[in-house]
């Protein structure tokens, strides 16, 4: 089971991220994997941005190929107490699920997500929120793991630039359209988020 300890909560507040010590239960992990695979199989032509809100029939105005039952599967995952109980340890008892996203990065596609702060994409004030990222495969520096810059959340919202997502030859070179101005942070301070399938950060 996932388990965020009191020391993990303090680490989250200090560093801006935490990796769960435990793993999702086999039942919940299989439920996520089944919903994820069905969604990807039906929508494999979509960009990363277009894979937002799989729990809503008309999420973000996107035209997903999905059934009402699949939406309900994602919604039930997002409301699952195994996940929500850990979020409550960080944010408190009054929490809502306001978004979900399937991040599908196929091998050898080169879809790099630029350095960013999640809050720049969220029209929410105050930004008393957190992301729960669940790995469905083992992830390390060799297959595109996330990276964090410890304590950068204490710097407030850093300047972001609009990223040109298309190369001169017309190829898509990345995902998401905002990136932190390189003058605002030191990438050498980053930490690789290496986790096993079924873990969460």
Say what each PLM segment does.
Residues 1-15, 20-115, 120-124, 161:
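Non-heme Fe(II)-dependent double-stranded beta-helix
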Residues 90, 123-141, 194-197:
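Short, conserved beta-strand element in jelly-roll/cupin
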Residues 141-201:
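Double-stranded beta-helix
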Residues 117-120, 133-134, 187-189:
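Glycine-rich, charged/polar anion/phosphate-binding loops
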Residues 19-20, 132, 201:
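Short hydrophobic-aromatic micro-motifs
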Residues 25-38, 136-158:
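Internal hydrophobic scaffold segments of catalytic domains
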